[in-house]
């Protein structure tokens, strides 16, 4: 004689509680899956859209390249006076 033998509906209640727990776990997993899927979609859209405050990624890359550009031009200007044309 165990404690659970006193009521015939105890097994039914246990099954219902287990089903509710499985449904809640399934809803949690489904919610996380949908959330991660939406994050991936929004990340791919963010790469093409505005990053913030009216700035996009393309001008940021252009600023990096333009920052390298004057350094190359300065090196070219420094090398030109030292070339054979000045001493020749």
Swiss-Prot record:
Biological processes, Gene Ontology terms: response to toxic substance
Family of this protein: Belongs to the stannin family.
Role this protein plays: Plays a role in the toxic effects of organotins. Plays a role in endosomal maturation.
Complex and partners: Monomer.
TM helices/strands, residue ranges: 11-31
Species assigned in the record: Homo sapiens
Name recorded for this polypeptide: Stannin
Spans within the Cytoplasmic topological domain: 32-88
PTM-bearing positions, type Phosphoserine: 49
Bilayer disposition of the protein: Single-pass membrane protein
Side Mitochondrial intermembrane, residues: 1-10
Gene Ontology MF: a single term: metal ion binding
GO cellular component, one term: mitochondrial outer membrane
Signal peptide per UniProt: none
Cellular compartments annotated: Mitochondrion outer membrane
